[in-house]
Curated annotation (Swiss-Prot):
The record marks 23 as: Substrate discrimination. Signal peptide: none annotated. Belongs to the DNA polymerase type-Y family. This is DNA polymerase IV. PANTHER family: DNA POLYMERASE KAPPA, DNA REPAIR POLYMERASE UMUC / TRANSFERASE FAMILY MEMBER. Binds 2 magnesium ions per subunit. The gene is dinB. The active site is at residue 116. It comes from Lactococcus lactis subsp. lactis (strain IL1403) (Streptococcus lactis). InterPro entries: DNA/RNA_pol_sf, DNA_pol_Y-fam_lit_finger_sf, DNA_pol_Y-fam_little_finger, DNA_polymerase-Y, DNApol_IV, PolY_HhH_motif, Rev_trsase/Diguanyl_cyclase, UmuC. GO terms for cellular component: cytosol. Its main location: cytoplasm. One of its GO terms (molecular function) is DNA-directed DNA polymerase activity. CDD domains: PolY_Pol_IV_kappa (cd03586). Residues 14-197 form the UmuC domain.
Length: 363
């Protein structure tokens, strides 16, 4: 008989910091004439034939409905938007400056990306008992010294802290206490749960799960049977349980991204195009962590859940999206791909970082 022990550590004090519209905010800071204008970080689609994707955009641009989209879609929504190609080196430099501010308060820092990080301030450098106090100090320091705003979430685990940071933006600060977690999560739509993708939402809705309250009342064994380990993790999260520790860069051994498809992929060209997109996300993560790897791993899962995994070792370390995509596509071509089955999941991972200095941008 399966058993599911519910062990909940509520003793930690975790802060999640999310820089507000980071790339766009840096550009507006450095060019005040852009203030209160719709700024989109992407190459101008009129100059690229409609190619390119939006990295981020200002809140003024988001008011037009622009979020994660192609540059062409962004232009269609807001023709008056100001498109800026972006300067990754500049953003990385600012990210390091944010990191130095974090280090005033704790060394227990985990970079989730170039513009967000988790901090464990249970024990901290200023002897503060209040995580809220530290979050306010960090917000103050970032605003005064860097001219930028960030949103902060405070709770007893990473999952809740991240949800809290997204609750009130921009420049918000939200606290979720242990005794408030269940009620807070009960009202939260399932699509707001970190890790629930677009393909999973309709499946949950079809089963009658629309919010955290529905998941709290679910049978964990049934969820696990339907969704595997992820179903059990979802049940735990709905009950405020997420005991993953804040991990610094020394514990990072690989960087990877996966995507599950509600509509199966069949054509090799479509699969290669998706591998390019995933490789771009892996590259962003590698760059934000200042890492390069010499092994690329491709993961492919068919509609019948048969999973293929193949790796390729390289003489040189890589980090660019083009290089990663090229290797991932080469690995795919070497697989005995069965086009009749259809692909439900693709994943790309880069590992074998070696002895390089792995200093994280925000860590």
């Amino acid at each position: 008989m399966l058993t599911f022990p519910l062990i909940n550590d509520t003793s930690r004090k975790i802060i999640h910091i999310d820089m507000d519209a980071f790339f766009a905010s840096v550009e507006v800071r450095d060019n005040p004439s852009l203030k209160v204008k719709p700024v989109v970080i992407a190459r101008n689609p009129l100059q690229t034939g409609g190619r390119g994707v939006v990295s981020t955009c200002s809140y003024e641009a988001r008011a037009f409905g622009i979020h994660s989209a192609s540059a062409k879609e962004a232009y269609d929504l807001c023709p008056q938007a100001i498109f800026i190609s972006g300067n990754y080196e500049k953003y990385t430099k600012v990210s390091k400056q944010v990191r130095e501010i974090f280090k005033r308060y704790t060394d227990d820092i985990e970079a989730a990306s170039i513009d967000e990080a988790y901090l464990d301030v249970t024990e901290n450098k200023i002897g503060a008992q209040s995580a809220i106090k530290i979050a306010k100090l960090i917000q103050h320091d970032i605003f005064v010294e860097l001219g930028l705003t960030c949103s902060a979430g405070v709770s007893y685990n990473k999952f809740l802290a991240k949800i809290a940071s997204d609750y009130e933006k921009p420049h918000g600060l939200t606290l979720i206490m242990p005794e408030e977690a269940l009620e807070f999560l009960a009202k939260l739509p399932v699509e707001k749960f970190h890790g629930v993708g677009k393909a999973t939402v309709p499946k949950l809705h079809a089963l009658g799960f629309f919010n955290g309250g529905d998941l709290q009342k679910a049978d964990p064994v049934d969820l696990a049977e339907r969704f595997g380990v992820y179903g059990w993790e979802l049940y735990q999260k709905a009950n405020g349980i997420h005991n993953s520790k804040v991990k610094n860069y020394r514990e990072r051994k690989s960087v990877g991204k996966e995507r599950t498809y509600g509509k199966l992929l069949y054509l090799p060209d479509d699969i290669k195009a998706e591998l390019s997109k995933i490789s771009g996300k892996v590259s962003d993560s590698l760059k934000s962590h200042q890492l390069k790897g010499s092994i690329v791993i491709l993961k492919l899962r068919y509609s019948d859940f048969t999973t293929l995994t193949k790796r390729k070792s390289l003489a040189e370390k890589l980090e660019s999206p083009e290089e990663i995509a090229e290797v991932a596509q080469e690995i795919f071509e070497e697989l005995e791909y069965d086009e009749s089955l259809g692909v439900r999941l693709l994943g790309v991972t880069v590992t074998e970082f070696g002895a390089q200095k792995a200093t994280l941008d925000m860590q």
